[in-house]
Amino acid sequence: KLHVLHGLIEMKSYDEVEKYIAYLKDDYHEKIGYISESIKVPAVAGFLLAKVREAKQKGISLLIDSDSMLLNKEGLDELYNELLIILGVLIDNSMESISGENDGKIIVYLYLNTEENILLCKVYDNGCGISKDKLENVFERGYSTKGENRGYGLNAVDTIVKKYNGLIDVESEVGKTTFTIELPIEEE
């Protein structure tokens, strides 16, 4: 992008420079800017930006739901750090389930409900899905349908959810999966 700007400046095409900068600004806001507007926790916003780029390199569309709102509330640093683990596992698993699929899509929804003191996290994908007979085992340590030395991520997510006396729900069928996690937050 800088090469384009440099070239346009060297050619003294200043009107084109202006147009290109406007395009970049709109493109940035459309694809990335909304993350920093709705996700106010810097570590989580940065992590999601990195995952959006990683997904794009794999041909997958990773979107943050436009209704997401994660405020940077004081005293929740540990919870936010554990949210990074949860998001990492769920997004990585989603990317693996989509691998090779056309029009792969992942949608992440995060919401800190300060009235009910709940952090809500949803991750949806249109990957291969999880069959009903395997759903009951996905949180067991070491259980995996992907081979040996796997099956620790969802167990870690389950451990975090239990630590906070939260809830985790999985809805899956062929072609789509949604993980929904509710984590109660302590009032200060």
Task: Describe each PLM feature range.
Residues 64-86:
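Conserved short strand/loop->alpha-helix "switch" segment adjacent to the catalytic nucleotide/phosphoryl-transfer site
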Residues 160-162:
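Detector for a conserved hydrophobic position within an alpha-helical segment of the HATPase_c
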Residues 125:
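Acidic ATP/Mg2+-coordinating residue in the GHKL
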Residues 19-22, 26, 37-58:
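Short beta-to-alpha transition helix within the HATPase_c
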Residues 105-116:
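Short beta-strand/loop element within the Bergerat-fold HATPase_c
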